[in-house]
UniProtKB/Swiss-Prot annotation:
Keywords: Cell inner membrane, Cell membrane, Membrane, Transmembrane, Transmembrane helix. This is Probable ECA polymerase. Probably part of a complex composed of WzxE, WzyE and WzzE. It holds the Pfam family WzyE. It is a multi-pass membrane protein.
Length: 452
């Protein structure tokens, strides 16, 4: 890459970043937080944060990358995607009507709410315990991260249930919403994330998500400022780099440490070059249509229920890894949101996907606002826990693609909804057995004596 080509890419990158950052800033000033703000920051991180890192790798370490015209296509496609997404998000198909009283779809009381978070926590802890009994601490047993996906590890499906510890702790926080509950959420979820990191053998998702939710709650409540958020972001990047070194068993120093930091940070937070690789091999892609979305559900179907279930799931990530990169190491490489759309339907699917994503984020914001307006604090805690708990799925959406997002959000919805139903059933059983008693508030002693 010549300096002239780099200068052209830099101009496009600056304009695109300024465009998205400006819209995000105006939205932040208007509402302080909604899921449009979160997705916009996540989109910036995924598709634009990596460009400076790539530039340093190219000019400092002479790392090979896709041709400049392909990198330009990747930047422009990301900017155009966001433009279509933003217009879709802001477009109203019907006029806003004044809220009229409607019969609520469901209600929650104190006992049901506490039962819900206990059930969610129980699902996570029992899954971790069973996985640990089968495998022990994989971080200290395995020699490479790819072994996590090998036949040496049993009960891999249980990892999907670990995440429900975070929604459980979110319910606990939203019932109190004070600084102590906020700090308790951070300590409990990060401690659980570190435990799963050691047990699973290097999975950092629970730690990243817990820390991100903690920061956004702090922004909403005004407990942290923007400069504190930026400082926490830098700390998070350094922390994730250290965990990555431990995960891959790397011992580096000097220039090698700087080089490793650059490419691991890029691959962790901003795999935008994967989109460029897909565009570079565009003519070799056999468009998969909507099949990757259907195939991604296969992993949730146990083999005893479907004995003939394919052992290899060809979703967009695996198609990109195996067919485009010809990589059969056992790891699935993230194609990114736009990359998954390219795999499914080529360039035509990019604006269509942007429209779909705009509607998805709009739905989450509607649910979030519903929780903000809800007078029943127990129901509001459940709604907010569901919305913030889905942040993991939005990260999957930006990094892994639309197919992975759909399957995971449906799975999250089913498990979360089932926990609600079980909590309501248990409450009904306890109430029928006469075990539920209404709380009575006793008068202060002075008032009691005055009434005697």
């Amino acid at each position: 890459m010549s300096l002239m080509q780099f200068s052209g890419l830099l101009v496009v990158w600056l304009l695109s970043t300024l465009f998205i950052a400006t819209l995000t800033w105006f939205e932040f000033r208007r509402v302080r937080f909604n899921f449009n703000v979160f997705f916009s920051l996540l989109f910036l991180l995924t598709f634009f944060f990596g460009f400076p890192l790539t530039s340093v790798l190219v000019f400092r370490f002479d790392v090979g990358v896709a041709p400049p015209e392909i990198l330009l296509q990747a930047l422009l496609s990301a900017a155009c995607f966001y433009g279509v997404y933003y217009v879709t998000y802001k477009t109203r198909l019907r006029k806003r009507v004044v809220d009229v009283p409607r019969k609520p779809l469901f209600t929650m009381n104190r006992v049901e709410t506490h039962l819900t978070w206990v059930i969610l926590m129980g699902i996570a802890l029992v899954s971790v315990a069973i996985f640990f009994m089968h495998n022990g601490f994989l971080l200290f047993r395995l020699h490479s991260y790819s072994q996590i996906f090998s036949s040496e590890v049993s009960g891999v499906a249980l990892k999907r249930f670990f995440y429900f510890f975070i929604p459980a702790m979110l319910v606990v926080y939203f019932l109190r919403q004070d600084s102590k509950a906020w700090l308790f959420f951070l300590v409990s979820t990060v401690a659980f994330g570190l435990l799963t990191y050691m047990i699973v053998g290097g999975t950092r998702a629970n730690i990243i998500i817990a820390f991100a939710i903690f920061l956004f709650i702090g922004i909403i409540r005004g407990w942290i400022s923007l400069w504190m958020l930026a400082a926490a972001g830098v700390l998070g990047i350094v922390g994730m780099f250290w965990l990555a070194l431990k995960r891959y068993g790397l011992n580096v120093s000097g220039d090698e440490a700087f080089y490793t930091f650059l490419y691991l940070t890029r691959d962790t937070f901003s795999p935008w070059e994967n989109l460029a690789l897909l565009l570079q091999n565009y003519h070799n892609i056999e468009f998969q249509g909507l099949a990757p979305i259907v195939r991604d559900f296969y992993v949730f179907i146990p083999t005893w229920l479907w004995p003939g279930r394919p052992s290899i799931v060809l979703n967009s990530a695996n198609y990109f890894t195996w067919e485009v990169l010809n990589n059969h190491s056992g790891l699935a490489i993230s194609p990114t949101l736009i990359g998954s759309l390219v795999v499914m339907g080529g360039a035509l699917f990019i604006p269509l996907g942007a429209i779909v994503v705009g509607m998805i984020i709009k739905w989450f914001d509607w649910l979030y606002e519903l929780g903000n307006r809800e007078p029943n604090r127990y129901k509001a805690a459940i709604l907010h826990s569901f919305c913030f708990g889905a942040i993991f799925n939005m990260i999957v959406l930006a990094r892994e693609g639309l197919d992975s997002f759909v399957s995971r959000v449906v799975f999250f919805l089913v498990v979360f909804g089932a926990s609600l139903l079980v909590a309501k059933l248990l409450f009904w059983l306890f109430d029928s057995a006469g075990l539920i008693h209404k709380r009575t508030t006793s008068l202060p002693q002075a008032q009691v004596e005055g009434k005697l």
